[in-house]
A protein has these predicted regions:
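Acidic, metal-coordinating catalytic segment for phosphate/diphosphate chemistry
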Residues: 1-15
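Short beta-strand scaffold segments in enzyme catalytic cores
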Residues: 14-18, 109
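Conserved Nudix-box catalytic region and its N-terminal flanking loop in Nudix hydrolases
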Residues: 25-74, 82-88, 244-269
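Active-site segment of metal-dependent pyrophosphate-handling enzymes
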Residues: 54, 62-202, 244-251, 288-292
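Long, intrinsically disordered, low-complexity Ser/Thr/Pro-rich regulatory/activation regions
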Residues: 103-105, 111, 289-331
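Long, low-complexity, polar/charged, intrinsically disordered or flexibly structured peripheral segments
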Residues: 182-220, 224, 228
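A mid-sequence, solvent-exposed acidic-amphipathic segment
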Residues: 208, 215-254
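Charge-enriched amphipathic alpha-helical scaffolds
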Residues: 275-294
Length: 331
């Protein structure tokens, strides 16, 4: 194959954002891929990923399910396609993909599971996504790092550019702006553009022809870096599910078959990253007629026994476009 043919060839990669709830927190399945030559695990986590094999995979989704199980010994349940990532210059794991000099186009998927089952696969772990985006968790109030770390850094970046500061202010709810939990991807990409995301320095060095070391966290406030552009893909997945729970009942893909309304609220709060008003949340659930009482109680609540419910999955046939509005708990 000629050099020009090689440089214009394309390899399709598949990446999975697999989300579960564990101990009240949203967690994501991560892997540490091994170097193709040294067989040493990466110092940074990434998402489960692998190449699409048109000879062996009938569809993208089947290919995704196959390599996620192979890498993590975990079987995916609910899956939906997220986005296609194909920007030139992406720091993609070429050796692991067998890509050589080919352009890598990644198709991202979102997977939801009710249980963060320990995979027992080496270099695989469930990690709280707040480790990667610590500014996204408002369940216990406004994160101090927004005003103590991010605001000063973004002001230095914006300088005298009013437009850039306006973008940062609106994205991160600075100077009185209102927080929008769905703008996860916009916030990460703004940090990347400002050079505050550690992956940005790595990618700039590579674009200049250098062989940079893996990025390290510049500050805990900026989140743990990931391999390739996997943190961008993860941000896309978080944005998607935060928006989708409001118009599709996908949150029930994260719930067991039987649950209490308190457990349902904690799950929604873990995903949305904001505290909800208990009574108003229950009114929303009752109004949408999404759940049905089982006439039994869960005694394992640490307090007064609570009624058990189930998701009325049969309602999807009549009302597929429904979700849960978020009645926020105001200060």
């Amino acid at each position: 194959m000629t050099e020009s043919a090689t440089s214009t060839s394309v390899v399709i990669g598949l990446s999975a954002v697999v989300v579960a709830i564990r101990d009240g927190d949203a967690v994501v399945l991560t892997v540490r891929p091994h170097d193709a030559i040294t067989d040493i695990a990466s110092p940074l986590p990434g998402l489960p990923f692998g190449p699409f094999d048109p000879a062996g995979h009938r569809t993208f989704e089947l290919g995704l399910r196959a390599f996620v199980t192979e890498q993590t010994r975990f079987q995916l349940g609910y899956v939906e396609q997220l986005y296609t990532f194909g920007d030139e210059g992406r720091d993609a794991p070429r050796a692991e993909m067998g890509a050589g000099a080919a352009r890598i186009v990644s198709v991202g998927y979102l997977g939801l599971t009710p249980t963060a089952v320990e995979t027992r696969a080496p270099d695989t772990a469930w990690a709280p996504w707040s480790a990667f985006f610590p500014w996204e968790d408002w369940r216990h109030g406004r994160p101090a790092l927004l005003d103590e770390v991010l605001a000063p850094a973004l002001k230095r970046w914006a300088g005298e550019d009013v437009g850039q500061w306006s973008r940062a202010r609106l994205a991160f709810a600075l100077d009185g702006a209102i927080w929008n939990e769905e703008r996860v991807l916009e916030r990460y990409e703004l940090l990347y553009e400002a050079g505050l995301a550690p992956e940005a320095a790595r990618d700039r060095a590579r674009a200049e022809g250098h062989d940079p070391a893996e990025p390290v966290a510049l500050s805990a406030a900026l989140g743990e870096p990931m391999i390739s552009d996997h943190r961008r893909i993860l941000a896309t997945g978080l944005s998607r599910i935060r928006g989708k729970i409001k118009y599709r009942p996908v949150v029930f893909e994260l719930m067991p078959a039987e649950f209490t309304l308190s457990a349902l609220q904690r799950t929604v709060e873990a995903i949305a990253g904001v505290p909800l008003h208990k009574q108003n949340f229950r009114r929303v659930v009752e109004r949408e007629d999404l759940v049905e009482g089982l006439g039994r109680q869960d005694a394992d609540t640490g307090g007064r026994p609570a009624e058990l419910f189930r998701f009325r999955r049969e309602i999807l046939a009549a009302r597929p476009a429904m979700g849960l509005s978020l009645p926020l708990l105001r200060d």
